[in-house]
Amino acid sequence: MTRMDAKTPVSTTLGVDRRCFLGMSASAVGVACLPGGYPARSRLLQPWAPLFEISLAEWSLHRALRNKELDHLDFPEKARSFGIAAVEYVNSFWKDKARDAKYVAELKKRCEGEGTKSLLIMCDGEGALGDPDEQKRKTAIENHHKWVEAAAGLGCHSIRVNAQSSGSYEEQQKLAADGLHRLCEYGDKHAINVIVENHGGLSSNGKWLSETLALAKHPRCGSLPDFGNFRVSDKEEYDRYLGIDQLMPFARGVSAKSHDFDEQGNEIHTDYARMLEIVVGKHAWRGHIGIEYEGSKVSEDDGIRATRKLLERVRDAMQAKLDERAKAAGKDGK
């Protein structure tokens, strides 16, 4: 594995003062901090800061991890080898280690050594938070407690969960909202947010999920909008651009799903320029956007690099437009 030292440049783009972005987005919102101080989106942006930072979701390397070509503890170093200094974990790659204090401490030490920030843990296989059976729902909530604790130990801001349930549209909303609210109450004890990804079933319906998050009525309950997970069923595909737009008001993170690329380096299933205009332009997102490569036509490493390059290219184009407008505004003001 090629190791990049602390001086290795990470993904950033320089440009004019981002404060000028305020007047260029009709829907720009004010400074908003989540519990624990994590910024959801900022109105007053720091000079020379990139429009958004890039993180790496561990799922991008799921084949290497499953084939024992990469150890979970080496993920921070692997991310740094791509010039990425923020990571998003997947619980299935360290399923029995959540309450292993030494293991969590070692992982945190590895991150600190690489200059890598832990953002969140994606949690699967712990039961349905919206299970119609009260006892099963309670068990699912409690099963997630250990990941809340692990996230706190690593310095994450959130755990990502699923809003699985069964029943009618409204019944599933009520059940999932109940489970989410109760888990968020535990998150309060550790300053950890509980965020839901559009991840199959009704959760891939942006309207249903946004309504469910509102119904949960807890400030720690948010979303992790994923560019590609909008298949509600084998017969129903939800509009991904509409879905992202509906989920962004609740966003605590953003997942840039990628599969395949054309000769120009564009993702062929998602128009990244259009998507980032929604995320960054309309909703003024200023947090990390996480690479989640899931394709198979190129290697995982190459897929990660291609996704990063695409994100940077679109980000640079957006920044160039802002710079031009800022210069024009400056001339008009003279």
How does the language model describe each region?
Residues 5-153, 171-174, 181, 188, ...:
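N-terminal pre-domain/capping segments
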Residues 60-62, 91-93, 124-127, 160-167, ...:
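Active-site-proximal loop/turn and secondary-structure-junction residues that shape catalytic pockets
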Residues 86-87, 177-278:
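Acidic/histidine-rich catalytic cores of soluble enzymes
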Residues 116, 192, 283-287:
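A short helix->loop->beta-strand "cap" motif at the edges of active sites that frequently abuts
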Residues 256-263, 286-300:
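Active-site clefts of carbohydrate-active enzymes
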Residues 274-284, 295, 313:
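Short basic/hydrophobic patches in alpha-helices and adjacent helix-turn junctions
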